[in-house]
Swiss-Prot record:
CDD domains: FN3. A motif (Box 1 motif) lies at residues 471-479. This is a receptor for the anterior pituitary hormone prolactin. GO terms for molecular function: cytokine binding; metal ion binding; peptide hormone binding; prolactin receptor activity. Belongs to the type I cytokine receptor family. Type 1 subfamily. Residues 30-128, 129-227, 230-331, 332-433 form the Fibronectin type-III domain. The chain crosses the membrane at residues 439-459. This is Prolactin receptor. It comes from Gallus gallus (Chicken). Residues 1-23 form the signal peptide.
Length: 831
């Protein structure tokens, strides 16, 4: 909390200074102490380099303290040593004492101090350069030598006991290496072994012990004469035309050989043999020749030489070839002006204007010039160069307010030639953009902003958690009733689905599914139709138990023992080729299905014993598989039976081939059987008595008398096999179930009736069948032959069709002329 408050206060204090900096005004830059120097160990001076002034007038003050004192003193003299300096006279100079010196720059906004400089007068002694250096050649015993003389520095007191040590250096004028000679405390020196006829350069310097060497004195030149000799060869330095109309050439003389020497410039033009002399030796100065318009020719090459002549002889320079077109170098531009423009609602900018050189004829187009300018801040060292082109005016927008700039311009011809010299330096001060009112506005805005920041930071410290919760509310959890968020976080999807009431898929059946295309109903002599005493409605006393059918709709009929046993017999009649196609797969399932069939036979026998006491009806025993649903009357509702039939038409039936009839009858598996109840048969008899029609019920045969086509022990159960639609009229096929080891078909005797037509569908899922008097009775001896023939023919047709589709005409042959199909002729058996 305390640190936040301190940082906020600092922001408030520094914000006005930052605002002023944005306005172009700031506290001054830090100055830098360049050097401190003592000329004679009695006085010394210090110089500094100012920093930026921050756009405001700045004062510089030098403060110093001595190592043995705590008091701070100010510079005693700011004038003697020049600007930006401080002079310490004898009264303020203490030898063997260390001075701690700093320079402080101050303006209206603030101040800034330099780094401290520690000074000991003994170690900063550097005397001035010797003065009055003179050179003279003398001859002694026909030997020529050089005599040099000088004086001590001007500030040296003659009455002082300081001794200066001197040093002299000399070199030939044309060479770069110096020869240094230590002189000692004397102020004169004799130099021998000099080459006659050579020009020499001489300098001298001094020092105090201890201390540093002074600067070298100014150069002095002298020619060592060599008696009587011709002059040396002169050198042509350059030729230049300022306006492409006239030109001038300059040369450098050689040694004169000890005699007065005259210099003559001679030239000739290309294509001419005549030699001309320089027309003007005065206009361009000494050692030069000026060619006016009369003597200047364009697109002509000049061959120029300079000849030096004295009493002993002459010497000529190397030839110099000149084409006026390529030696054009104009004079610098003139009348350079700088003007600061201050438009309304815009930033100020600088306008530079200049004029071409006076000698250049740019109006007539004889000479076209291109311009280039350079500028830099007064304190800067690097120049910024801008190419302007042929215009004589330029606007500059990106100048820093409060700075002082130096600007120069030069020019050159547009095609051939070289750049002129830079014009003289021009200075301009860029004022600050912001006025006092603007500064006040920015200061007020800065203070208000700092207060707002302080309030926000204080609020964040006090109510940080509440504000974070308000700005970033937590993500709400799921609000679905019954969902456990812990289950979602742990990723237990199964437990989550069970909590929502979503159950998994039902388990698959252990046996192969068999889907039947048609239903067949067979009736015998002892099967009696139960009369109904109700108008399409079941008895109110009847207790109906519903059974949720399988999603496959028809498995109860498909997997019935009577159907499967007959399928086994029909499949055995197929050719041997068909019987061996899937034998390998079927044999692998034999062991498992035999054990399952044994359980079914035991349950069936138990059901036969329980149903033997009833004389009116029989029901189906149900083989309860795991996860099976409670039983219900599946065939009391023709609507439900019809739905089951429609669902089975879209399912593929797997065909299984077997080896022989005995194995197929024993290994056919059952999936589901639909049980009936004894109480329903009584209610169906009442329904039959009212409507005078028959229903699909079968009466149990109590006696051991064998029917012409079935065993008495196998007549306990009747099931609806399939509901089909033929010619837009519903029909029902019923199938009896056999448990005998062998399936045989017999026709019904003349005394029995066969119900083959559906009269109507009553309410409450009642199916009404009508007897058909047109059905002929086929002798029992002919049925096996037809069945075998039909099985062979059907096997060839359904070899590659998986036993899913069968022609209705073939079914009529199996049922003795009725209009219902017997699926036992085309459905495969199961292993």
């Amino acid at each position: 909390m305390k640190q936040d408050l301190i940082s906020s206060v600092q922001i408030i204090l520094f914000l006005p200074l930052t605002t002023v900096g944005l306005a172009g005004q700031s506290f001054p830059g830090k100055p830098k102490i360049i050097r401190c120097r003592s000329l004679e160990k009695e006085t010394f001076s210090c110089w500094w380099k100012p920093g930026s002034d921050g756009g405001l007038p700045t004062n510089y003050t030098l403060f110093y303290s001595k190592d043995s004192e705590e008091e701070i003193y100010e510079c005693p003299d700011y004038r003697t040593s020049g600007p930006n300096s401080c002079y310490f006279n004898k009264n303020h100079t203490s030898p063997w004492t260390t001075f701690n010196i700093t320079v402080t720059a101050t303006n209206e906004i603030g101040s800034n101090s330099s780094d401290p400089q520690y000074v000991d007068v003994t170690s900063i002694v550097q005397p001035g350069s010797p003065v009055n250096l003179t050179l003279e050649t003398k001859r002694s015993a026909n030997i020529m030598y050089l005599w040099a003389k000088w004086s001590p520095p001007l500030l040296a007191d003659a009455s002082s006991n300081h001794l200066y040590h001197y040093e002299l250096r000399i070199k030939p004028e044309e060479k770069e290496e110096w020869e240094t000679i230590s002189v000692g405390v004397q102020t004169q020196c004799k130099i021998n072994r000099l080459n006659a006829g050579m020009r020499y350069v001489v300098q001298v310097r001094c020092t105090l012990d201890p201390g540093e060497w002074s600067e070298w004195s100014s150069e002095r030149h002298i020619l060592i004469p060599s008696g009587q000799s011709p002059p040396e060869k002169p050198t042509i330095i350059k030729c230049r035309s300022p306006e492409k109309e006239t030109f001038t050439c300059w040369w450098k003389p050689g040694l004169d050989g000890g005699h007065p020497t005259n210099y003559t410039l001679l030239y000739s033009k290309e294509g001419e043999e005549q030699v001309y002399e320089c027309p003007d030796y005065r206009t361009a100065g000494p050692n030069s020749c000026y060619f006016d318009k009369k003597h200047t020719s364009f697109w002509t090459i000049y061959n120029i030489t300079v000849r030096a002549t004295n009493e002993m002889g002459s010497n000529s320079s190397d030839p110099h070839y000149v084409d006026v077109t390529y030696i054009v170098q104009p004079d610098p531009p003139v009348n350079v002006t700088l003007e600061l423009k201050k438009p309304i609602n815009r930033k100020p900018y600088l306008v530079l204007t200049w004029s071409p050189p006076p000698l250049a004829d740019v109006r007539s187009g004889w000479l076209t010039l291109e311009y280039e300018l350079r500028l830099k801040p007064e304190e800067g060292e690097e120049w910024e160069t801008i190419f302007v082109g042929q215009q004589t005016q330029y606007k500059m927008f990106s100048l820093n307010p409060g700075k002082k700039y130096i600007i120069q311009i030069h020019c050159k011809p547009d095609h051939h030639g070289s750049w002129s010299e830079w014009s003289s330096e021009n200075y301009i001060q860029i004022p600050n953009d912001f006025r006092v009112k603007d500064m006040i506005v920015w200061i007020v805005l800065g203070v208000l902003s700092s207060l707002i920041c302080l309030i926000m930071s204080w609020t964040m410290v006090l109510k940080g958690y509440r504000m974070i919760t308000f700005m970033l509310p937590p993500v709400p959890g799921p609000k679905i009733k019954g969902i456990d968020t812990h289950l979602l976080e742990t990723g237990k999807s199964e437990e989550l689905l069970s909590a929502l009431g979503c159950h998994g898929l039902p388990p698959t059946s252990d046996c192969e599914e068999l889907l039947i295309e048609y239903l067949e109903v067979e009736d015998s002599e002892d099967q009696q139709l139960m009369p109904s005493h109700d108008n399409g409605h079941p008895s109110k006393n009847a207790k109906i138990t519903r059974k949720e059918t399988d999603s496959d709709s028809g498995r109860g009929s498909c997997d019935s023992p009577s159907l499967l046993s007959e399928k086994c017999r029909e499949t055995c009649a197929l050719p041997p080729v068909l019987q061996t196609q899937e034998v390998r797969d079927v044999q692998e399932k034999k062991a498992a299905k035999r054990s399952w069939e044994t359980q079914y036979v035991a349950s069936e026998r138990k059901a036969l014993l329980s149903n033997s006491e009833s004389a009116k009806s029989s029901t189906w025993p149900a083989v309860q598989l795991p996860n099976s649903q409670p039983p219900m009357f599946a065939y009391h509702s023709i609507v439900d039976a019809h739905k089951i039939t429609l669902n089975t038409t879209n399912t593929n039936v797997a065909a299984v081939l077997v080896e022989d009839e005995e194995e197929h009858q024993s290994q056919c598996s059952l999936t589901e059987t639909i049980p009936g109840e004894m109480e329903k048969q009584g209610e169906m008899e009442n329904l039959h008595s009212k409507t005078e029609q028959t229903t699909a019920q079968v009466k149990q045969n109590r006696s051991n008398e064998r029917l012409p086509f079935l065993d008495a022990a196998l007549m306990d159960y009747v099931e609806v096999h399939k509901v089909i639609r033929q010619d837009e009229e519903p029909a029902v096929l019923l199938k009896h179930k056999e448990n005998s080891g062998k399936i045989e078909k017999y026709t019904i005797s003349g005394a029995s009736k066969e119900y083959t037509k559906v009269s109507t569908v009553m309410d409450h899922n009642i199916l009404v069948l009508m007897p058909d008097s047109r059905v002929p009775h086929t002798p029992a001896s002919q049925e096996p032959a037809k069945e075998t023939s039909q099985s062979l023919q059907q096997g060839q047709v359904e070899k590659n069709m998986s036993y899913c589709l069968t022609a209705p005409s073939d079914c009529k042959r199996e049922t003795g002329g009725s209009e219902y199909m017997d699926p036992s002729s085309f459905m495969p058996s199961f292993k």
